[in-house]
Amino acid sequence: WLVPAYSAATAPVGALFALMTKVGVYTILRLWTLLFSSEAGASALFGSLWLIGGGMVTMAFGAVGMLGSQRLTHLAGFAAILSSGTLLAAAGFGQNLLTAGLLYYLPSSTLAVSALFLTADLIDRWRNDGASYAPFERSDNAPFLNAELVPTEGLNLDEDEEVLIGRVIPAAAALLGLAFIVCTLVITGLPPLSGFVGKFAMLSALLNPLGLTASAGTQPGAPGWTLFVLMIATGLLALIALSRAGIRHFWSTHVGVAPQLRVLEGLPIAALLALCITLTLLAGPV
């Protein structure tokens, strides 16, 4: 229900819903670590296997959902599910270093998903031109491919046969493209932004539960290795899904006017992504 509900709402409401989703995740983390910490005696780490298992299933569901989605708002909704599953699975281990990494990753992923909701609304409005069909429903998205999806020989990819060098890119289109790229980097955990820093901290904590300076014999168990592989695999699937969407919306044939972007529409996106960059610059050892 989450993805259809978030996608049906307006872009600002969808962005706020993404924020509220992570508030729920933080509530679970806060209460669970308070009531069932490793020092809670007989109830220590109660339900940890449920958190780890449920989080991993949520990660897989979110990644597969992103791979099967073509609308940007659906991609953003499944990205919220994917990041929430990552946080829940990491929280279930009850490790200090892993918790530190997820606490850094939590605001970063939240800001990026919220920015993606806002960016998706502007991109859809530009690409659809007010029509009732979505960009992926057009049959001429790739006129340079034949029926076998192979590039046609001798075809000039510029339909107007103009020189490709020196063509002007509208400022609004460039800003939308840049915002989409930054969201993609943070959500998928690619360097050099905060998504990579948070995921790297969690992966490092999984491989070295007691820290990099700990002695040998502290290798992760089966749940740790499973989460390690899932984090890398789901990041790859998310990258494929978002890259495919970016190619469809920014590189496909589009006949229409340049996007119109008002300052008040771009400021929230810029502020959210600026916070992600700030998190990157202020990252440090725990």
What do the PLM-derived regions correspond to, one by one?
Residues 1-50:
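Short helix-boundary/re-entrant hairpin motifs in multi-pass inner-membrane proteins
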Residues 5, 32, 85-97, 184, ...:
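Interfacial segments of multi-pass membrane proteins
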Residues 9, 66-141:
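Alpha-helical multi-pass transmembrane bundles of energy-transducing inner-membrane proteins
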Residues 9, 127, 131-180, 235, ...:
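Cytoplasmic/organellar membrane-interface segments at the starts of transmembrane helices
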Residues 9-19, 162-168, 211-233, 257-261:
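Membrane-interface alpha-helices at helix entry/exit sites of multi-pass transporters
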Residues 30-38, 182-204, 274-286:
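Alpha-helical transmembrane segments and their membrane-interface junctions
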Residues 42-58, 105-110:
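Structural signature of hydrophobic alpha-helical transmembrane segments
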